[in-house]
Amino acid sequence: MASQLTDAFARKFYYLRLSITDVCNFRCTYCLPDGYKPGGVTNNGFLTVDEIRRVTRAFASLGTEKVRLTGGEPSLRRDFTDIIAAVGENDAIRQIAVTTNGYRLARDAASWREAGLTGVNVSVDSLDARQFHAITGQDKFRQVMAGIDAAFDAGFKKVKVNTVLMRDVNHHQLDTFLAWIQPRPIQLRFIELMETGEGSDLFRKHHISGQVLRDELIKRGWIHQLRQRSDGPAQVFCHPDYVGEIGLIMPYEKDFCATCNRLRVSSVGKLHLCLFGDGGVSLRDLLQDDAQQYALEERISDALREKKQTHFLHQSNTGITQNLSYIGG
């Protein structure tokens, strides 16, 4: 086995976020408010199942333990179940998760679980059906809620729910969210609104620090949990009176990048060292044959030497990220 992926700042990388499409059928205000528009970048098509098999095999050989399938909306791929199974061929990968808008979850949760999926994250930015419609552009609140129930029925022990925290939209709804998770094994993760190339005006209007919620949670007796090495960036809190948990993802907080453990590959096979970095390193030419695996691992390892110590969001430098559907948020 090749050596564990490590960068110049001694950070080890156990977690791959793999985008398999940038197409999405929702029009969320903070991501694709005008809907999905095909770009020239996808002219060669998205990664095939065989290419996905090869890239995840290389990352598994380099110490990756967790793969999250992202988009766009991953379940729009007709071969999504085959993709899950292909990633699962790697014994070293212990967790295979998906981030989804949930619109196909009620129909497909059981088949995804059977294919090897171990974790589900569902985007839900409001528990009010009308506000959900206003944020997403889709009147699918009840369908998404049914999907979460279906995930539990399919055998998922916990469901993670992602909620983008927005001032004057949902930041004042903490009590509603807490009541929802009190009897349910849901980890509700509030994600600070992040500035993107296309979303600067929205950011200035609606950004609020997660620190506000953290202070309130601590005041109410919530307890901060320790992170595991392949966990994402959320600070997780639990409370003895709640079955559910709260997570806070605060990319503007000091030292957010110090514990970075994840890399990203786009839906067209580019390795991105940071969600808000520049450029990216193409891997696709080395995904065409199994015999290329050693060269692929070398390219990934070499690229990691260029990973910066931190992002530059504080200077409003969003890198190449025009919207969050591009490399999977």
UniProtKB/Swiss-Prot annotation:
Reported cofactor(s): [4Fe-4S] cluster
Binding positions for [4Fe-4S] cluster 2 per the UniProt entry: C257, C260, C274
Catalytic activity field: GTP + AH2 + S-adenosyl-L-methionine = (8S)-3',8-cyclo-7,8-dihydroguanosine 5'-triphosphate + 5'-deoxyadenosine + L-methionine + A + H(+)
Pathway where this protein functions: Cofactor biosynthesis; molybdopterin biosynthesis
Cofactor descriptive note: Binds 2 [4Fe-4S] clusters. Binds 1 [4Fe-4S] cluster coordinated with 3 cysteines and an exchangeable S-adenosyl-L-methionine and 1 [4Fe-4S] cluster coordinated with 3 cysteines and the GTP-derived substrate.
CDD domains: Radical_SAM, Twitch_MoaA
Binding annotation for GTP: R17, R68, T99, K160, R262, L263, R264
NCBIfam families documented for this protein: moaA
HAMAP family xrefs: MoaA_B (MF_01225_B)
Family note: Belongs to the radical SAM superfamily. MoaA family.
Record's protein name: GTP 3',8-cyclase
The encoding gene: moaA
